[in-house]
Amino acid sequence: MSDKLRQIAFYGKGGIGKSTTSQNTLAALTEMGQKILIVGCDPKADSTRLILHSKAQDTVLSLAAEAGSVEDLEIEDVMKVGYRDIRCVESGGPEPGVGCAGRGVITSINFLEENGAYDGVDYVSYDVLGDVVCGGFAMPIRENKAQEIYIVMSGEMMAMYAANNISKGILKYANSGGVRLGGLVCNERQTDKELELAEALAGKLGTKLIHFVPRDNIVQHAELRRMTVLEYAPESKQAEEYRQLAQKIHANGGNGTIPTPITMDELEEMLMEFGIMSAVDESVIGKSAAELAAAV
């Protein structure tokens, strides 16, 4: 494993556009001459679909189940090579409601390390579900694999709530390992004062807003063709946005911070400061519209 290897991770709540953002950013990094390995750590197994032009890659866990055990697999069975020679692996997870989805993450990373998948690459990128930072999904952080965490969020309250929760997970392991918060990436949802809120949250968490990715329908057009914007429309404004994000991440090595998570009350206070949320009158909690009208 190379001394200069950068191990980064993209975390974010489900549906925030984390996998799309990460794949486009990593594609942009290859234009800068960087060699990339993607390790998908999301049970949806969609962390590599735009790179491989596929619906979903076969996962380490599903292939291991077919073969008998992970020891019966070869690295070629689980690692596929896609756009601009990006190496792709999906860890996978168990059937819904059965077992720990994080188990696939642990199994995959151990298998990849033991079989030389990290050799000759400049970046390993973990794409991780981040609604809950449970033990399994926190594995890239806990085991000191991912050194730089980039949280994909938006100006929506639950996306900011998830970003704060992920920061708590990073803080828990920051002192025992070397993991740091690299910064926030705001994937625009066109909510009120979104840029200002993202910058304010970054300040509260003791980090910075790495990049504000504007909303553009070209992303959806590319996704329908299972392609990154970099491949589908390389001359587009959106492709340039991802190039800028890639350049900022590339220049950010060693600049991560130990996050300073906030409370739910502080998050709500921040929303009130920006006029997104009004102070709540406790006397109206739990009252229906009809009850409130009758009380007038």
Swiss-Prot record:
PTM annotation (ADP-ribosylarginine): residues: 103
Residues the record lists as binding ATP: 12-19
Reaction catalysis annotation: N2 + 8 reduced [2Fe-2S]-[ferredoxin] + 16 ATP + 16 H2O = H2 + 8 oxidized [2Fe-2S]-[ferredoxin] + 2 NH4(+) + 16 ADP + 16 phosphate + 6 H(+)
Annotated binding of [4Fe-4S] cluster, by residue: 100, 134
Molecular function (Gene Ontology), one example: nitrogenase activity
Top class in the EC scheme: oxidoreductase
Source organism superkingdom: Bacteria
EC numbers: 1.18.6.1
GO biological process terms held by the UniProt record: nitrogen fixation
Cofactor binding comment, as recorded: Binds 1 [4Fe-4S] cluster per dimer.
Post-translational modification: The reversible ADP-ribosylation of Arg-103 inactivates the nitrogenase reductase and regulates nitrogenase activity.
Keyword Oxidoreductase (UniProt): yes
Keyword Oxidoreductase: yes
InterPro entries registered for this protein in UniProt: NifH/chlL_CS, NifH/frxC, Nitrogenase_Fe_NifH, P-loop_NTPase
Cofactor(s) demanded: [4Fe-4S] cluster
PANTHER family, per database record: LIGHT-INDEPENDENT PROTOCHLOROPHYLLIDE REDUCTASE IRON-SULFUR ATP-BINDING PROTEIN (PTHR42864:SF2)
HAMAP family assigned: NifH
NCBIfam families from the UniProt entry: nifH (TIGR01287)
Role description: The key enzymatic reactions in nitrogen fixation are catalyzed by the nitrogenase complex, which has 2 components: the iron protein and the molybdenum-iron protein.
Complex formation: Homodimer.
Protein family according to the UniProt entry: Belongs to the NifH/BchL/ChlL family.
The protein's name: Nitrogenase iron protein
Gene: nifH
